[in-house]
A protein has these predicted regions:
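N-terminal nicking endonuclease/strand-transfer module with a His-rich metal-binding environment
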Residues: 1-167
């Protein structure tokens, strides 16, 4: 059984942190901050084994849609062409696009220099659980704790050998 830990941090402008960069790191992916033009690359993070975005009921529908033009552009990309599983690559692209859109919309809304843009929660998972048990437990926990209370949740499971955690 892993040693339990649960850490909560605030991601805000005042500390110079980038919510886009934090999400890219969390998801082991590439994301662009539309406000600054900065692109965050974390595609070499191999410990990301599962990622999800759970939207609350009142989240705008357009945050959940990926424009057809963006899909066509991705399907022409080297990243898509080199993918062993094209369907999985397309789903990952759509999910990353939705997350990037969510956080860029937060940045457009929260302009204050001391704005709290999001909260980061990290907790351990029992290493004895199967991947599916980890996903099921985490999904249920996040749904009840955050999404049902009107929050969106951008989360992933990281597997660092004998340390498995949700961030």
């Amino acid at each position: 059984m892993a040693i339990f830990h649960y850490t909560v941090k605030i991601v805000g402008r005042s500390k110079g942190k980038s919510i886009i960069s934090a999400s890219a790191y969390l998801n082991g992916d590439v994301m662009k901050n539309e406000e600054t033009g900065r692109i965050s690359y974390y595609t070499s993070k191999r410990e990301v084994v599962y990622t999800s975005l759970m939207m609350c009921e009142n989240a705008p529908q357009e945050w959940q849609n990926v424009p057809a033009e963006n899909i066509r552009r991705f399907q022409k990309s080297v990243r898509y062409k080199r993918a062993d599983n094209k369907e999985a690559a397309l789903e990952k692209f759509k999910l990353t696009f939705q997350k990037q859109r969510l956080w860029n919309e937060v940045l457009k809304t929260e302009k204050s220099a001391d704005a709290q843009l999001g909260r980061s929660f990290e907790f351990s998972l029992p290493k004895e659980w199967s991947r599916q048990e980890q996903i099921d437990y985490t999904t249920e926990y996040i749904q009840k704790t955050f999404v049902d209370k009107g929050m969106c949740a951008d989360w992933s499971i990281h597997d660092k050998g004998d340390r498995k955690s949700v961030v």
